[in-house]
C-alpha cells in the first residue's frame, strides 16, 4: 500500500513539474544495525542517538518510511527544492507526512529530517497536515486515547481537519502508531 501510494505521488509530482525519487525505503534489521553502528563510530553515540534509529526502532524497518531526494536539484538543500515544496503541499493527499519537521526536535526526539516521509494513510495524513501538529502530537492527542471503540466519538478529526476528512477507526490508529525513531 505504501509503495503504491509513493509511486502514485511521484507520478503526480512529475505531472506538476516536480521531480524526486526515494533514496531509502525499507531497511532490514541487520542493515539498520550496521548503519547505526557506522554513524556512532564516525560521529559518536550521542550524535547517532539524535540522528538515527537503532535496529528494531526505525520507521524504515516498517516499510512505511521513505527518504526523498530531488532528481534535478542535487546541489541544493532539499528544503530549497521544488520537490520539497511540492511534497509539503501535496504529500498528505497521498497518505504521507513529513515525519521530523524543523523546529519540532524537542517533540519528535530527532533532528529535523525534511526528506523523511512516513506513510500513515490518506485520512490520517490529511488530518495531521490540517492540524498543524507533528505526528507525535497528533497521535498522542487524537489517536491513542481512542483504543476503546466505545469511547471514541463519531469523528475525532472533525475539529482538526477539513470537512472532507473521514473518521479514523481504531484499526487505522493502531496501524498508524508512530515508531520510536527515524532513519
Where are these regions (language model features)?
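Cell-envelope/glycan interface and biosynthesis
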Residues: 1-160
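Ser/Thr/Gly/Pro-rich low-complexity, disordered linker/stalk segments of secreted
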Residues: 152-183
